[in-house]
Amino acid sequence: MAPTKQQSQKGVKKGGKKKTTDPFSKKEWYELRAPSMFSNRTCARTLITRTQGTKIASEGLKGRVIQLSLGDLSDKTQDIFRKFKLQVEDVQGRHCLTNFHGMDLTRDKLCGMVLKWQSTIEAHVDVKTTDGYTLRFFVIAFTKKQEDQKSHAYAQTTRIKKLRAKIVEVVQREVARCDLKSVVQKLIPDSIGQDAMNEASSIFPLSGALVRKVKVLKKPKLDLGRILELHSEGKADEFGEGVPRPDHYEPPVVNAV
């Protein structure tokens, strides 16, 4: 007996097989450029969907935040435990111009610094730079044994308060008189933490002091000229180079345009 129409269509899916498309075929790569404070300028790449209709790719990239190790931003492999956040401020061609957005330490570095038989001092302070950025600094310090201490390096509560006040004073002094570019240049070798340890050691011996974290709380209004200045090195950049001309060169006269 021949099958009925209902039996012949049993097990057949509606619509047939869907066409599969590669999701990466609609995306394009953009290069991320770090500010001039870092030696490795072209540090990473990022993906974005191509411009379609009113959805512009460059506008979708603005505000994107990436986190990179200092080892990727410079040639100093011994400082890979420092992580810097960069935020895309402007897009020029296929280059994303970024700006400093924060700093942090890796988890294993923090866990390796915290030891028993010592006191841990933590301090935080909000400081405003000369160019209008409000930054929050988190500093961590550790005590070490004095000559009359044998088994531990604990500090008294009164000394811990004095140490914390001295650390806050040093951070405010070093940051308030600098712009953002100078602050980042101090964060790369952590000269702020070193200065805090040197001055606070007069109160109680310290084995180390580090800027543990930096947050950007407030930014000034976006200024494209300031961003371009932050990415300039005082010489020709990758976006264009000067063409050598002979002395007394005059461009040819064009008859028609």
From Swiss-Prot:
It is found in: Cytoplasm. Keywords: Cytoplasm, Ribonucleoprotein, Ribosomal protein. Residues 1-24, 238-257 are annotated as: Disordered. The keyword Protease does not apply. The keyword Cytoplasm applies. Residues 1-10 have a biased composition (Low complexity). GO terms for molecular function: structural constituent of ribosome. Residues 238-250 have a biased composition (Basic and acidic residues). Signal peptide: none annotated. It comes from the Eukaryota. Its main location: cytoplasm. One of its GO terms (biological process) is translation. One of its GO terms (cellular component) is cytosolic small ribosomal subunit. Component of the small ribosomal subunit. Mature ribosomes consist of a small (40S) and a large (60S) subunit. The 40S subunit contains about 33 different proteins and 1 molecule of RNA (18S). The 60S subunit contains about 49 different proteins and 3 molecules of RNA (28S, 5.8S and 5S). Belongs to the eukaryotic ribosomal protein eS1 family. This is Small ribosomal subunit protein eS1. It comes from Taenia solium (Pork tapeworm).
